[in-house]
Structures are given as C-alpha cells and as structure tokens.
Amino acid sequence: MWLCPLALTLILMAASGAACEVKDVCVGSPGIPGTPGSHGLPGRDGRDGVKGDPGPPGPMGPPGETPCPPGNNGLPGAPGVPGERGEKGEAGERGPPGLPAHLDEELQATLHDFRHQILQTRGALSLQGSIMTVGEKVFSSNGQSITFDAIQEACARAGGRIAVPRNPEENEAIASFVKKYNTYAYVGLTEGPSPGDFRYSDGTPVNYTNWYRGEPAGRGKEQCVEMYTDGQWNDRNCLYSRLTICEF
C-alpha cells in the first residue's frame, strides 16, 4: 500500500514539467514581464564641475552721470630745443658826460691821502719783513704752510697770485722769505703736458729757471715746484704743505 503515494508523487512531477534536484532546489521557467513602474523621485544634485574659461568682455556701459574731478598735474616735460638767437638790439642813448677828474678837488685830495697811506703801510711792512718790493712787484708772506691749491686760493682772495720769479732779483726776494721762516715754499709753476715741461699759471713757457742739479726728475709724478732755502728749485708733489708767498 505504500507504493500508491510514491506513484502519485511521480505522476504529479511529470505533469508539471518541473525537474527537482537532489538538493530540493526547483528552477521554474521565466514568467510574463510585468507592467512598467511609475517614475521615481528626483535624485540629489551632483558635485560642482571644473571652472570654465572666462567669457568674452561685455559691451561698454553708458557714461556715468557724475563727472570725475581732474587728475593731478603730470611731470614736467623735457626742455625744448633752444630757439634761434635774436637780433642785436639798438644801442642805448649816450649818458651825460662825467665830471673831469681835475675839477673834482675833493676826489683828488682823497686819492692823494690814500696813496700816502699805502706808501706808509708798505714801508712799515717792509721793515717788519712781511713784504718785499722788487721793481713793480710786491711779494708778501703770512708765514703759514699749506698745499699748492690752498696757496693759490689764499693769494687770489687777497687780490694777488702765488709768487713766481721771472729773474734772479725776484728769485732772491722769494728766497729771503724761505730763509726767514726756514721752510720751503712753492712757486707759481706747474708741469705741462710733457714731463719736465714746467710753465707759468697762464700756460706760457718759463723764461727763467734756477733748478737744483739733476732736477726736475719727477718724470710727470711731481707737478709743482718748491724753492729751497738757497733759492734753488726742485719739482715736488703738490699735496705737501709749503710756505705761502704771494705777489701783487
């Protein structure tokens, strides 16, 4: 009687076309597709994309209603080209004639007194050894020793120039100051473009010299001239301090 249930089971399995595995897992045939579902809810916003290239400039806007204040003044420009020289002007009117000197007795008296005072002063200074007169020249010294350029400036401020001998008499007069103060002195000569070519301050060649034997020997490195106590000359660097002697 137990065969009946078993036979019934086999008949049912054959009728349904189903195949049962040994592990009790059944695989059916695909069913009929269902109807499409309704639309789902909107998704979340995605992340920001990469920055794009700048767009072209927009059109110019209309001018503003409020005008801007004027800017600051610019820098001065370069000077212009000089203009042509103007024509020479006409000569001015001739002034009134001056008073003849011989008619001005007061002026003549003043000049006479002035000359007398100058002669008295010159005589007093000569006795003190502060000045010496040779011909039309007057030599003077203050006893100070400074550089060549400083001597030139000091003499110019006094209305003279640095002393320079142009003959033996003037050389001896300058040497007397050198002996008195027992120190060397510059004379108004400087070396020209060529070594050993010494000239006066106006650039003219010397017409009188009293060089010590073998001098000048600086070969362009000693451009000034100093005087020894015996009156002889030597070329020397201009930066040394030497006795100030001026001529007027």
UniProtKB/Swiss-Prot annotation:
Q: Where is this region: Disordered?
A: 33-101
Stretches assigned to the C-type lectin domain: 132-248
Specify the effect of residue 233 to R: In ILD2; impaired secretion
Changing residue 238 to S has the effect of:
In ILD2; impaired secretion
The protein's GO terms of the molecular function aspect are: carbohydrate binding
> Which positions form S-S bridges?
155-246, 224-238
List all annotated glycosylation positions: 207
What the entry lists under SMART domains is as follows: CLECT
Compartment annotation:
Secreted; Secreted, Extracellular space, Extracellular matrix; Secreted, Extracellular space, Surface film
PTM characteristics: N-acetylated.
Renumbered to this chain, the Pro residues biased-composition regions fall at: 54-70
Which residues lie in coiled coils?
none
Q: Where is the Collagen-like domain?
A: 28-100
Question: In the UniProt record, does the keyword Secreted occur?
Answer: yes
Q: Which InterPro entries match?
A: C-type_lectin-like (IPR001304), C-type_lectin-like/link_sf (IPR016186), C-type_lectin_CS (IPR018378), CLec_Tetranectin-domain (IPR051663), Collectin_CTLD (IPR033990), CTDL_fold (IPR016187)
Q: What else is known?
A: Pulmonary surfactant consists of 90% lipid and 10% protein. There are 4 surfactant-associated proteins: 2 collagenous, carbohydrate-binding glycoproteins (SP-A and SP-D) and 2 small hydrophobic proteins (SP-B and SP-C).
Associated disease: Interstitial lung disease 2: A form of interstitial lung disease, a heterogeneous group of diseases affecting the distal part of the lung and characterized by a progressive remodeling of the alveolar interstitium. The disease spectrum ranges from idiopathic interstitial pneumonia or pneumonitis to idiopathic pulmonary fibrosis, that is associated with an increased risk of developing lung cancer. Clinical features of interstitial lung disease include dyspnea, clubbing of the fingers, and restrictive lung capacity. ILD2 inheritance is autosomal dominant.
Q: What is this protein called?
A: Pulmonary surfactant-associated protein A2
Organism of origin is Homo sapiens (Human)
